């Protein structure tokens, strides 16, 4: 089969299953609105949970950083791309989250892939929550280690897998807050099972950091758990992009030597690192923002009980409405867009078959009347 025939067949198959993805050019978005060429929408698809992407102090910090350092890092951190701004941010993150070391990566995807690829060998084993993020599962599947999956958020299932002998090391992998369902992992129980067997726990807290725990330290801090490896990302509550790996000094040194995603990637611009340092300060003092976000979550859940859709067991900013049918989820999304509301449909393979949904996300920037408008639109569609 030639290349064109292969691509045509795959694209036709994707179109026929109501799973076709499209990008749309937008002018800008924030925690409340999305601005497109055809107008302004209420934005219920943003991960900008605290509204920090438009924070004046963070914008100013980036501008000052660009004036001081220029707009790019110029190379890998192993060559020319590691500046004082990067070093200060790493130390700030380590001090804040209670770890000896932090290492910056260009994205959460890169951090998850880089850590797993560097640590695991063919004698090792990865045991992951079956609903873990694609970056974690792909890294595990591509690594030489054996992959086993435990039932979602069930420590008993994990314990059964851990009881099976492994020649090498075992790494248990989960998310702190799950990106598609919004539910929280029982981290204390998972960590206890992991430690009993002398293994390591790696937690991706992309959707917990900034919004959970004291000073926004995340779901691990909230549950009084300190995993051996903690991944935090900056594309959600921080309002920017990038990620960091928190770990002990020996592990950090190992990753500096062996994590190819770190070694061979151009590091984030120093101006971005400086902006992230300001974002950390905003998060640390952001109790009012977190309180406002929680009020919006509570209000949404009260109102959504009246809708003919299934809610997940989520107390976080991620509040999916399970529609099940792929075509219906797309129709709902399009109907909402016609009414000035931006909510995207999430379908397989991002979520399991039969669980298509509207992935609604709430932020501290939303107002109660915004949620009322969303509810009215959803009721109108069903009627």
Swiss-Prot record:
Binding positions for pyridoxal 5'-phosphate per the UniProt entry: 108-109, 179, 207, 233
Metabolic or biological pathway: Cofactor biosynthesis; biotin biosynthesis
Residue list for modification N6-(pyridoxal phosphate)lysine: 236
Named cofactor requirement(s): pyridoxal 5'-phosphate
Keyword Transferase among record annotations: yes
Protein family according to the UniProt entry: Belongs to the class-II pyridoxal-phosphate-dependent aminotransferase family. BioF subfamily.
Record text on subunit structure and interactions: Homodimer.
Protein name as annotated: 8-amino-7-oxononanoate synthase
